[in-house]
Amino acid sequence: MPHRAPRRFMKTAPGACDWEQCLLMGSGEPTRARAVVSSSHKQRKPRQEISACLKWLVFLLNSIVFLVGVGILALGVYLFIKDFREVKLVDIILNPAILISIFGFSICVVSFFGFMGALRDNIFLLKCFAACVFLSYILVVAVTLVFFTLFYTDTTEGLSANWLLLYAVKNYHTNRNLAEIMDALQENLECCGVSSIAQGYRDWNMSYQFNCTNSNPQPEKCGVPFSCCRKSVISEAAGSSNPLLPAMRSLECWQNALTKRPGDLEHDIYTRGCLQPLRTLFESHAVHVGAFVALLIVPVCISVCLTNILAKQVDHQRYLLEREARRNDRRRKRDHNRRDQLNSLDLLEEGKFNNASANATRPRPPDIPPPLPPIEHVPRKKSRNASSSPTRKPKSAGVENAAARRKRTATTTRTPPAAAGPAPTPQATTTNRTHQWVLQQTDLVPQKSKS
C-alpha cells in the first residue's frame, strides 16, 4: 500500500476546495463553508524593500545641511540689514551679504528636497535633490574655470582680471561695494592701482573722483584712496603725543599723489599695482582650489548615488504595493463569486425542500389503471368451402361488391386507437361477440381458418 502524505503537507489546487470545505458544502452548512473560504485567503503584506538605515541616513545628513543653510541665510540677512545700502543688479555679485544670503538659501532648498523626499518616500523630491546637487557641482566647476581664465589671461581687452580691476577703479565713486572691494585689496596686498609694477598708483587718474583734469570739481582731485597709504605712516603718527597728528598725516599721504614722482611717494603710499600681487596670490593657492574642487566630487557622487538607490527602492516598494492591491481586488472578486455560488446553492436547496414538502402534503389520486388499447381486427380473405346444402345458391357479383364497400366503410369509420374510450364491460364484450357471429354468418367478415 503506497505511503500517504499527512494532511498538513497536502496541497490543493488554487481553484479547488479543501476536503473540510467540500464536506461542509455537501453537508448543508453553507454559512460555515463561507467562513472557511473567506478565512483561507489572508491579507499578506508585501516585503519591505526600503532600507531603513539608508532612509534615515539620508534624512539626518540633509537635516544637518539644512540647519547649516539656515544659519548661513540668517547671517547674510543680518549683514544686509545691518549695513543696508541701495541694491543694483551688479550688487548681487559684489555685495557679500547678498552672496551669503543666496548661498544659504540654495543650501536650504536643496537639503529640503533631500530630507523631505527621504521622510515622505517621495520619488520626485529625491530626484530633484540629486539633480540639484549635481548641477551645483557643475556650477562650482564652472566658476573655478572662470577664475583660472581670469588670472591666467594677459589680454587687456575682454574679460580678465586686469579689465575687472580697471572697471573697479573707474566706478570707485559710484558703487560702494566696488569701493570696499578695492580698499580691501589695496590694504591687504599693499598695492595701489592696477597694472604697473612701479607706477600703479597713476591708474587712479582714470577715476572721476581722483583725476587731475581741470574739469574735476572734487576735493580729492589728483589724489589716491586712503587705502593706498602705508600702514607704517599711520602707526607712527598714532604713537605721537599729538592727537591730531594721525589725521593730518593720513591726509598728507594721499593728497596730490598723482602729481608727485614715485621716488617721493615710496615712504607714504604703495606705488605698485594690485594685478601682479593678486595673480601671485591666486597662483599660490591654485593647487589647493583645484584639489578642493576635485575632491568635492566624492561627497557629491555619494549623495547622488544614495539618493538614487533610495528612490529606486521607493519605486519598487510602490510597485509591490500596487501589485498586492491588484491581487487583493482579484481575491475579493473571487470570494464574492464564491459567495454568490454558495447563495445560489442555498436557494436551490431551499427550493428542493419546499417542493418535497409540498408534494408530501398534496393528496394522492386513486390508483386507476391506464385504459387498454382497442383490439384491432385485421380482416383476412379466406376461401370458404362450398356449401353442401343444395338449396343455397352462390352469391352474385353485385352482392360481393356491396359487401366489399361495406367493409371499406366500416374500416374508415372505425375509431382510432388514440381516441378509444374506456375499457369495455363484460356485457359490451358479449354483444360484440354476437355481432361478430352475425357478420360471419352473412359473409361480411371472413371466418377464421380451422387448423
UniProtKB/Swiss-Prot annotation:
Motif Basolateral membrane targeting mapped to chain: 20-24
Tissue: Expressed in the germline, particularly in sperm cells.
Region (Disordered): 328-451
Function: Functions redundantly with tsp-12 to regulate cell surface levels of the BMP type II receptor daf-4 (but not BMP type I receptor sma-6), probably by regulating endosomal sorting and recycling of receptors, preventing their targeting to degradative lysosomes. Together with tsp-12, regulates cell fate specification in the postembryonic mesodermal M lineage, body size, male development and vulva development, probably by positively modulating BMP-like Sma/Mab signaling. Together with tsp-12 involved in maintaining the structural and functional integrity of the endosomal network.
Record's GO cellular component terms: apical plasma membrane; basolateral plasma membrane; early endosome membrane; late endosome membrane; plasma membrane; recycling endosome membrane
Annotated family: Belongs to the tetraspanin (TM4SF) family.
InterPro entries the UniProt entry points to: Tetraspanin/Peripherin, Tetraspanin_EC2_sf
Biological process according to GO: nematode male tail tip morphogenesis; positive regulation of BMP signaling pathway; positive regulation of egg-laying behavior; positive regulation of embryonic development; positive regulation of vulval development; regulation of mesodermal cell fate specification
Organism from which the protein derives: Caenorhabditis elegans
Regions of compositional bias (Polar residues) in chain numbering: 435-444
Glycosylation sites recorded in the entry for this protein: N205, N211
Subcellular location: Cell membrane; Cytoplasmic vesicle membrane; Endosome membrane; Early endosome membrane
Topology Extracellular: residue spans: 78-96, 152-285
PANTHER family: TETRASPANIN, TETRASPANIN-14
Ranges annotated as spanning the membrane: 57-77, 97-117, 131-151, 286-306
Effect of inactivating the gene: Viable and fertile. No effect on sup-17 localization in embryos. No effect on tsp-12 protein levels or subcellular localization. In a tsp-12 (ok236, ok269 or jj300) mutant background, exhibits vulva morphogenesis defects resulting in vulvaless or protruding vulva phenotype, impaired egg-laying with severe maternal effect embryonic lethality, smaller body size and reduced RAD-SMAD reporter expression, a reporter system for the sma-6/daf-4 BMP-like pathway. Males have severe tail defects including crumpled spicules, fused and shortened sensory rays and smaller fans.
Compositionally biased intervals (Low complexity): 410-434
Comp. bias (Pro residues): 366-376
Highest taxon above the source species: Eukaryota
Recorded topology in the membrane: Multi-pass membrane protein
The protein, known as: Tetraspanin-14
Keywords of this entry: Cell membrane, Cytoplasmic vesicle, Endosome, Glycoprotein, Membrane, Transmembrane, Transmembrane helix
